């Protein structure tokens, strides 16, 4: 089976502007049409839930985009893989934590899409929490990693190790969900990334300015 994968991030124009993804829904639909015309039998798209600044209306736009593609290209097998946003070092979103509503948002997309015959493949929210813990963790996590290595690579091992180290580590909330100040010294501040800190702060501020921009200023479709 021949297929292509497109990283759309979201079906919302507003969210794509926040992450500086230069794609429109029309371009995505046209790509699907061309894929079918070119002999491909399936199309895979990749998105995220819980991107900083995302609202439920943005998730609705993702569902609408997928339904629009299905209607425009009947017979093309559609898959949407979706992960939870996890902050990464040396990126404009390194100061943002994991959205506490991300799991519910994945469930919303699943309900909207699977009933339409669209294959929805969410990544594990619980493992995304562990990813965020490791992504934003500092030297204090060394003992946790030793314990999980001993107990085995499972969610239960991380929970057990974190419980045993209670009082020796900041709460999970701090590492995973809290938004950090741009003036805060980060665990990786001593390392030089591809972009200087001033550039990351500038890009982060530009994205943040879009958070409260009214949805009406963007092209919106209606969720039936």
Please tell me what each predicted stretch does.
Residues 1-72, 91-104:
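Conserved non-cysteine loop/helix-boundary elements of the Radical SAM core domain that shape
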Residues 3-7, 42-46, 79-82, 121, ...:
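Structured core elements
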Residues 13-19, 47-57, 73-100, 116-142, ...:
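Flexible glycine/acidic-rich beta-alpha junction loops that bind and position SAM and/or redox cofactors
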Residues 35-38, 76-84, 170-179:
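Short, compositionally biased low-complexity segments
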Residues 69-73, 113, 208:
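A generic secondary-structure signal for well-formed alpha-helical elements
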Residues 100-116, 148:
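C-terminal helicase module of SF1/SF2 nucleic-acid helicases/translocases
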Residues 115-224:
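Radical SAM enzyme core and accessory elements
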């Amino acid at each position: 089976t021949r297929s292509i994968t497109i990283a759309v991030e979201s079906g919302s124009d507003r969210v794509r502007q926040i992450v500086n993804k230069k794609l429109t829904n029309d371009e995505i639909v046209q790509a699907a049409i061309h894929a079918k015309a070119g002999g491909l039998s399936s199309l895979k798209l990749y998105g995220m839930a819980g991107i900083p600044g995302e609202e439920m209306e943005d998730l609705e736009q993702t569902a609408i985009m997928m339904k629009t593609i299905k209607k425009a290209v009947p017979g093309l097998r559609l898959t949407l893989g979706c992960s939870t946003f996890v902050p990464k070092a040396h990126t404009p979103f390194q100061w943002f934590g994991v959205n506490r509503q991300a799991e519910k948002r994945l469930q919303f997309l699943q309900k909207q899409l699977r009933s339409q015959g669209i294959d929805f493949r969410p990544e594990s929210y619980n493992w995304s929490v562990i990813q965020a813990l490791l992504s934003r963790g500092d030297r204090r996590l060394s003992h946790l990693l030793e314990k999980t290595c001993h107990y085995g690579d499972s969610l239960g091992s991380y929970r057990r190790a974190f419980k045993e180290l209670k009082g020796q580590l900041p709460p999970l909330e701090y590492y995973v969900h809290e938004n950090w100040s741009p003036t805060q010294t980060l665990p990786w501040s001593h390392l030089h990334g591809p972009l200087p800190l001033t550039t990351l702060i500038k890009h982060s501020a530009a994205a943040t300015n879009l958070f409260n921009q009214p949805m009406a200023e963007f092209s919106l479709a209606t969720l039936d």
